[in-house]
């Protein structure tokens, strides 16, 4: 059995120089150049700290004497041929006083008030005891729209739009009929369309039932391939069902 003092040695008493571990390399961001370019876009010279990027003045444009002083505008020549303004009245001139009109303003104003149409008060309603007033027309309490002459009648623009849709459908049907003769296309009837739709839904239910019966753990390649195949079939069936449900009129080509 080893003694407990085997690790002790006299050489351990010799002082040794402690070596500092080397420093890790300084972190440098990979986006440093991108950030610098972005900062240069939004910064302007003479507005932020740092060396201002201004144009170096030319030695020829040195500062001259009186170059900073404001210059007077050019002197305009007085034109004596322009028309003169009327003279200022003298102090001795007095305006004509005592001119009166024969119009009776009192009777005229009274007649205007009597013959004028009385101002109708604005219809309002009060919903609180403190006198909170609101407009009656815009409140919805007054039957305004149901009393109109055209209430309940289909607007003209909707009738026009329906006619345009009907006309476009007729033109499309005529175009399809022409192509039917050329390409021998066949239109699916409502019964055939419903039968195809029900068949697709039935196929989807069968594939979905088979998909639900898969094991929880997919731990082999064949299981994974089978699961992907079932998912692809279900996705294709869902796409076909949505297309048939969305389009009421379907044409097929006779091969």
From Swiss-Prot:
The keyword Hydrolase does not apply. A motif (SH3-binding) lies at residues 83-89. Transmembrane segments: none annotated. Pfam families: Enkurin (PF13864). Residues 1-10 have a biased composition (Polar residues). One of its GO terms (biological process) is flagellated sperm motility. It comes from the Eukaryota. GO terms for cellular component: 9+0 motile cilium; 9+2 motile cilium; acrosomal vesicle; axonemal B tubule inner sheath; axonemal microtubule; sperm flagellum; sperm principal piece. Residues 1-25, 67-96 are annotated as: Disordered. Residues 160-252 form the Enkurin domain. It is found in: Cytoplasm, Cytoskeleton, Cilium axoneme; Cytoplasm, Cytoskeleton, Flagellum axoneme. Residues 73-83 have a biased composition (Basic residues). Residues 160-255 are annotated as: Interaction with TRPC proteins. This is Enkurin. The gene is Enkur.
């Amino acid at each position: 059995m080893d003694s407990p003092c085997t690790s002790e040695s006299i050489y351990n008493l010799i002082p040794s120089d402690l070596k500092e571990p080397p420093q890790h390399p300084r972190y440098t961001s990979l986006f440093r150049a991108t950030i610098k370019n972005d900062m240069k876009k939004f910064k302007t010279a003479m507005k932020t700290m740092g060396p201002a990027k201004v144009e170096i003045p030319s030695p020829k444009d040195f500062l001259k004497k009186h170059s900073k002083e404001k210059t007077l505008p050019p002197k305009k020549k007085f034109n004596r041929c322009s028309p003169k303004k009327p003279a200022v009245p003298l102090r001795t001139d007095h305006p004509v006083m005592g001119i009166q009109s024969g119009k009776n303003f009192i009777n005229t104003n009274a007649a205007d008030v009597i013959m004028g149409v009385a101002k109708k008060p604005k219809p309002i309603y009060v919903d609180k005891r403190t006198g909170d007033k609101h407009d009656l027309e815009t409140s919805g309490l007054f039957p305004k729209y149901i009393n109109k002459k055209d209430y309940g009648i289909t607007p003209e623009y909707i009738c026009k739009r329906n006619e345009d849709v009907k006309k476009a459908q007729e033109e499309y049907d005529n175009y399809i009929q022409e192509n039917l003769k050329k390409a021998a296309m066949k239109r699916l009837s409502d019964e055939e369309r419903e039968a195809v739709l029900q068949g697709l839904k039935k196929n989807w239910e069968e594939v979905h039932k088979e998909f639900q019966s898969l094991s929880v753990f997919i731990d082999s390649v064949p299981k994974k391939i089978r699961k992907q195949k079932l998912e692809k079939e279900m996705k294709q069936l869902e796409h076909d069902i949505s297309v048939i449900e969305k389009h009421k009129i379907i044409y097929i080509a006779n091969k």
